[in-house]
Structure formats: structure tokens, C-alpha cells
Amino acid sequence: MNSLSFLNHEFEAFPSPELALTDPNGLLAIGGDLRPERLLTAYYHGIFPWFNADDPILWWSPDPRAIFIPGQVNISTSLRKYLKKQPWRFTINHAFTDVMAGCAQPRRKQAGTWITHEIQMAYRELHHNGHAHSVEVWHGERLIGGLYGLAIGQVFCGESMFHRETNASKAAMLLLQQHLINMDFKLIDAQVMNPHLESLGAKPVKRANFIQLLTQFRDNTANPAAWIPSEVTLEL
């Protein structure tokens, strides 16, 4: 029988993702904290935090899971033509804090954000420790889009993206998958399917299959050059 686990502030093991609730889909545990070691343990086992500002910390492992395989991200002919016309430039790990702040801005028709100050502080610490990373899209000196997430071995766990100009978040995703191919990453965890991810080629897989893929690649050593701050070219 699936049941909700309650975590305290002492570090403890997460329950198996198989025990997550089906309604709401994937809710596994409640409580605990956002210390780096707890967050890294969560992602290592296919679990991530997602909660509103007034809620306790909620931990999830949904079924199905949204994933990308690097090299299988879709780019339509119209998007390719659009991006070729843009004077944008792209960087890796140049403005992590600003990317998080961009992602934290409430979306249209949303009253608030799940990327709270607490979340931002926790992931900035992960970035400082070399675990969380960002992709930036620039128009001149203006940050117009980007995304951030965590690297666990040869797996990139995407967290959020944003745009301030049309298609800038899609460009960030395309740049990310290009970079991950070059650095021999094997899997992108996109967490929960939505129309935006689906349009880019995300696929839903059963949680058990996702955990199998995660287990296969999470202990592999990543290319040490993967997250050196750099300016890169989007190849279209």
C-alpha cells in the first residue's frame, strides 16, 4: 500500500519512489529540509522538491516521468529559421543567480511561484558546490532566457526555464541538449510532462524505467570540462 512519509530535520533515507501516492501523482514525502546532502540524495534516487511558499517541503517522484534523450530534442523548421535570425549569444554557468531569479518570476495567470527564496538559497549553494548549473541566452547584455538544473553523473535534472523574448527558453533547451551531447551525458530528467516540453520532444516513461535509466548513468563520471563557465555557439 502506498503511503505518505514524514521526514524530520535529522538526515534520513527517503522512502522508495515506488511508494509514492497516485493522487496526487508522485507525492512521496513531506517535511525535512533543503540541505545540499538531502537534495543530492533526493535527485540521486529520482526524487525532487516542489512546493508552494506557504506549504511544507513536498517531495515527488511522479509516474510517468518526462525525459529527453540528448540528440532527440525536436526543432521545427520554423523554429530553426527563427533562431537563425536572432543575434543572441549563449553561455554556460555565467549567471546562475539571475537565471533562478528569472525562473522565479510568476508566470502569466499565476499568483505566485514555487521557486521561493528558500529554494533559491538552496540551489545557489548547490551551484557554489559544483552541482547545479545554468544555461543563459543573451540579447546584447540583457539576459532574455535560460534554464537551470543539477548534474548527477551523466544525468542532467532540469528544474525550470524562463524567457523574456519569444522562443528564448526553447533556444536554451536546444543549447543544453547540444552541450550535453558534446559532454557525453546520457539523460535529461524533465520531471513532469507539459505541452511546452512535449513540443520539444520530451517523452513520458514509466517511473520504473526512468529509475532504471537513472541508476545506469548516475554513478558515471561526467566530463570535467562540462560546467566550466563558457560562451558557446548554438549549432542549427
Curated annotation (Swiss-Prot):
The keyword Cytoplasm applies. It is found in: Cytoplasm. GO terms for molecular function: leucyl-tRNA--protein transferase activity. It holds the Pfam family Leu_Phe_trans. Its EC number is 2.3.2.6. Its main location: cytoplasm. It catalyses: N-terminal L-lysyl-[protein] + L-leucyl-tRNA(Leu) = N-terminal L-leucyl-L-lysyl-[protein] + tRNA(Leu) + H(+); N-terminal L-arginyl-[protein] + L-leucyl-tRNA(Leu) = N-terminal L-leucyl-L-arginyl-[protein] + tRNA(Leu) + H(+); L-phenylalanyl-tRNA(Phe) + an N-terminal L-alpha-aminoacyl-[protein] = an N-terminal L-phenylalanyl-L-alpha-aminoacyl-[protein] + tRNA(Phe). Signal peptide: none annotated. The keyword Methyltransferase does not apply. It is an enzyme of class 2 (transferase). Keywords: Acyltransferase, Cytoplasm, Transferase. Functions in the N-end rule pathway of protein degradation where it conjugates Leu, Phe and, less efficiently, Met from aminoacyl-tRNAs to the N-termini of proteins containing an N-terminal arginine or lysine. Belongs to the L/F-transferase family. HAMAP family: Leu_Phe_trans. This is Leucyl/phenylalanyl-tRNA--protein transferase. It comes from Shewanella sp. (strain MR-4).
